[in-house]
Amino acid sequence: MAGRLPACVVDCGTGYTKLGYAGNTEPQFIIPSCIAIKESAKVVDQAQRRVLKGVDDLDFFIGDEAIEKPTYATKWPIRHGIVEDWDLMERFMEQVIFKYLRAEPEDHYFLLTEPPLNTPENREYTAEIMFESFNVPGLYIAVQAVLALAASWTSRQVGERTLTGTVIDSGDGVTHVIPVAEGYVIGSCIKHIPIAGRDITYFIQQLLREREVGIPPEQSLETAKAVKERFSYVCPDLVKEFNKYDTDGTKWIKQYTGINAISKKEFTIDVGYERFLGPEIFFHPEFANPDFTQPISEVVDEVIQNCPIDVRRPLYKNIVLSGGSTMFRDFGRRLQRDLKRTVDARLKLSEELSGGRLKPKPIDVQVITHHMQRYAVWFGGSMLASTPEFYQVCHTKKDYEEIGPSICRHNPVFGVMS
């Protein structure tokens, strides 16, 4: 370990990419996962096209810079957690490494993350990019859910370090409920929910559009996003919450002030019901999506009930939140309450059906919140990549040259025993 440079940890999500060095408590950069490229439709001869292609390959921006370039085409290479455009992803990684991390890839091991149910072929593509294009000495591709479980060890609620638990990973583009037993994902039981951060933003945008006329149309989405991040919370009871706002509006209704990008004048809007109705679509999805009506607590319950019977209790006991969309105030508390109701009702029913002969042992339902939730996956990666074990399980350049990209199809679990 001595004298070795720290590993680079890169967590690419649908909306944001988190990057930094292992051993740190938070990522050095959090940038939008987008890339701005020049799309030219000029008709030129062969020789000129060759010159232009070389120049165009270098003429691109990523992250916040990409969003600010109106003359470029902005692309998002990752959709619903899975990489869709590998050429763009390679260029994206190029700037991540050289411009942001300012690292020499030959000197650092890399830990990259992957969504649940990622295909082995995708792991091979990742390995090819990292070993062929960037010549890295070692690569480990970690499952996001396992890293999120490791990150939850920082919580005071966690007594012992375990890699068994249910991870609710809700980012910008997708929400997954992933059961993990001893560090291995139970793939057949994963469920995904078509509601995530972006859907909440769209829903708030729609609510604001119906009521507030002063928002410039081209800024309505970013206004909705700011309202969501600044003011939203999860309420325990919808009807009571509506009554609160109706009886004592001045206490609950907030003001948001934005600046019109074109006229540079200020505009102010009132933020009322949107504060709690936004995140409420996790618990009442039919508000935003008529095709999907299953609340998140029922999805979690169904996932755990589909798992092998001997891991169900530990899965209920260790429900870990991860990702930016779980950051709403009281999200964990509401989820725990709803889930406990479902579980207790089932136990009560089984007792009644047995005519009182069965006395089921109560099930301990615990939803774990911790201060690393937003970057849980990155932070879990940072913790695990700073252990000596990490370097033993990494796939090295030597292995890659001997065997080929197929070595990255399987990445052994580690960090459980320590």
UniProtKB/Swiss-Prot annotation:
PROSITE patterns: ACTINS_ACT_LIKE
InterPro entries per record: Actin, Actin/actin-like_CS, ATPase_NBD
SMART domains reported for this sequence: ACTIN
GO BP, sorted A to Z: Arp2/3 complex-mediated actin nucleation; positive regulation of transcription by RNA polymerase II
N-acetylalanine modification, residue list: A2
Record's function text: ATP-binding component of the Arp2/3 complex, a multiprotein complex that mediates actin polymerization upon stimulation by nucleation-promoting factor (NPF). The Arp2/3 complex mediates the formation of branched actin networks in the cytoplasm, providing the force for cell motility. Seems to contact the pointed end of the daughter actin filament. In addition to its role in the cytoplasmic cytoskeleton, the Arp2/3 complex also promotes actin polymerization in the nucleus, thereby regulating gene transcription and repair of damaged DNA.
Assembly and interaction partners: Component of the Arp2/3 complex composed of ACTR2/ARP2, ACTR3/ARP3, ARPC1B/p41-ARC, ARPC2/p34-ARC, ARPC3/p21-ARC, ARPC4/p20-ARC and ARPC5/p16-ARC.
Protein name per UniProt: Actin-related protein 3
Source organism (scientific name): Gallus gallus (Chicken)
Gene this chain is encoded by: ACTR3
